[in-house]
Amino acid sequence: MKALPSTKERFALALRELLESNSFESISVGDIVGLSGLSSRTFYNHFRDKNELLAYLYRITVEPLWYTDGKRNSLETFFTCCKDNFHYNGTLKGFGNALSYYGQNDLRSEIENKGVEDLVRLLKWNHFPGAITPELREVLRFFMCGITRYFEKYYLDSKTIQVDWLYTFWINCVPAYLAEYLVKEPE
């Protein structure tokens, strides 16, 4: 028997559905609440605003892409999963509608923050010998910023730019002492 979605997941599913055909700015909390079948009070008991819900939706959508058949993916496989989820099954497509919003709690910031945490986790998984310092996190953030800007350009330019080479390009730009631990295949 399949478990029912949690309250947070119900709001996230409603937002995902709305993002398929609407810009993020045009979606109101009332729209999300109406589609979810829950109350505004329940929404605000779980989220500060729709931006926090969008961040939650992003996290629960991307986290499973790190794993295939219960095994951890390499960074290259993760990039491929993200690309495939954008192109083929539309899982990530709705997020493109939210990239045009700049402001407090914007999706871009969430992608960069989650990306840094994912890369730190990958370094730890691959037994990176150095300390995870604030400076190291800033190096990783710099590269995550580049990826989000490229993805945004790709989305806004009607997919005229190829993303197939993004992993190779990105990993060649990362300092070698980090790249070695980011590209290792899972043990």
PLM regions: where:
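DNA major-groove recognition helix of helix-turn-helix
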Residues: 11, 15, 47, 54-58
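Helix-turn-helix
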Residues: 18-52
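Short, basic, alpha-helical segments at the C-terminal edge of helix-turn-helix-like DNA-binding modules
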Residues: 28-29, 57-66
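Amphipathic alpha-helical packing segments from all-alpha helical-bundle domains
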Residues: 103-130, 134-149, 179
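Short glycine/proline-centered loop/turn elements that form peptide/ligand docking sites
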Residues: 23-29, 50, 129-135, 180, ...
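Hydrophobic alpha-helical connector segments
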Residues: 67-97
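C-terminal peripheral helix-coil segments that are non-catalytic and often amphipathic
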Residues: 153-187
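Short hydrophobic clusters on alpha-helical segments that form packing/core surfaces
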Residues: 7, 11-19, 115
